[in-house]
Amino acid sequence: MSIKTYDKENSEIHVKTPVESTLWKQSQKKAFNKLKSKINIPGFRKNSSSPQFDKIARAKISKNDIWAKAIDETLNSTFEIARKELDKEDLERILGRANYRVSKITEDEAEIEFFWPVRPEIEDFKYKNLNVKFKEVKVTKKDIDQRIQSLMEMGAPIEESNEPAELENEMVFDFKGFIDGEEFEGGSAEEFKLKLGSKSFIPGFEDQLVGLKAGDEKEIKVTFPADYYVEEYAGKESVFKILVHKVFKPKAKEINDETIKELGFKGVSNLEQLKEYLRPSIEHKLLEDSLTEFKNEAFNKIKELNDIKIPRGLLLEEMTAINEKFNETLKAQGLKRREYLEMTKLSEEKVAEQVKKEAITKINEYLIFEQIKKAENVTISDDIIEDHYNIMAKNYNIEVDKIKEFIPVDKLKEDPNLLNEQVILKLLEVNDKSAFEKANALGKAKNPKSSKGKEKNNG
């Protein structure tokens, strides 16, 4: 008889299930026969069926080895029995695959305990009245000019320039970093090449390089993030001495009717039409940025207001995935893990702490999305899908029907990113109705068929 329990602290459903008695006996016999087939005993042919051979083989093979193989043999059938104990509500709460442990084992009986990570029970989940502001979306002349400039630079040759650097330009420079007046490990480089805006450095670093030109020297101040991977630097203010060697800019095409026509946008043949055409996609990008900013701040508040238990099984899965990705990144950079640890002066224990911290952050976000989705019954409607097709058609300059050929409706209905976007909008709605209505109106305005009249009155 199976026994089901709920581990609230680790947010897991546990089911203890005995292995069927006859199956357990047969599996041990089968396991022994497999193991004895690999043993060579002088005076006997290999895998002999004689009782004397079996007696000697049993003395050589440990019970634990037999039981381990026998458990493997019975695992699937026992799992299916355990799974029948889960009701509809249990199945809806499960967030990942089951793990197991052997809770009882002898020659006569065995019991396997399966445990599934589940969505935690959060009593009185608080996600409303967070007092988080939504940044108003407004397209400026500068936004449009920058987008046009980037279009004119697409595919253009890169050349050295004496002009001040802008975002997306490449820069070659020396830097030397100091914390508390002391130069710190890994904080210096010579003739380092960087694309400004790539976010390769800590926040604020690249922004302060904008406007510098070849030969310029500057001291910039930045603060390491509180969760920075090198604990000794986390949260500390640092000063970097910068010397710029070179700035590279794309040689942009001249903006005229001819180069605008070459972009291939339907119905666009001059500058005013191009500005009109680009405004919705720029607006959409700004809307996405504002929603992301709102989400980050709102989720931080939600974490403070609620006791969210992290499912142990999900945490282990996420930590494994992060570790594997980390190793792949090191391999792509031609580094071994040991070399990385030596360079950064980190121990495996410190890396494990950081991996766990990152995993908890990701799982917290996932659980908050799931909790709001359930509380507000958020789904992807047909209208949302149609709006999304229209946005993609506008952004990629492709007919809606062509987009639908590449991305069928069923795939969009299951798109986790699109669903999460609806969750964020719902969170905005229940916290700031006025801001939601403005954001939702902007989302609808992305439909190319209905946006033109509105765009002329903006920014």
Swiss-Prot record:
Cellular localisation: Cytoplasm
SUPFAM superfamilies: FKBP-like, Triger factor/SurA peptide-binding domain-like, Trigger factor ribosome-binding domain
Keywords: Cell cycle, Cell division, Chaperone, Cytoplasm, Isomerase, Rotamase
One of the protein's GO biological processes: protein transport
Subcellular location, principal: cytoplasm
Region (Disordered): 439-459
GO cellular component terms, semicolon-separated: cytoplasm
Residue span(s) of domain PPIase FKBP-type: 168-253
Record-linked PROSITE patterns: FKBP_PPIASE
EC number: 5.2.1.8
Record text about domains: Consists of 3 domains; the N-terminus binds the ribosome, the middle domain has PPIase activity, while the C-terminus has intrinsic chaperone activity on its own.
Family to which this protein belongs: Belongs to the FKBP-type PPIase family. Tig subfamily.
Protein name (database record): Trigger factor
Organism field: Mycoplasmopsis pulmonis (strain UAB CTIP) (Mycoplasma pulmonis)
Lineage of source species: Bacteria, Bacillati, Mycoplasmatota, Mycoplasmoidales, Metamycoplasmataceae
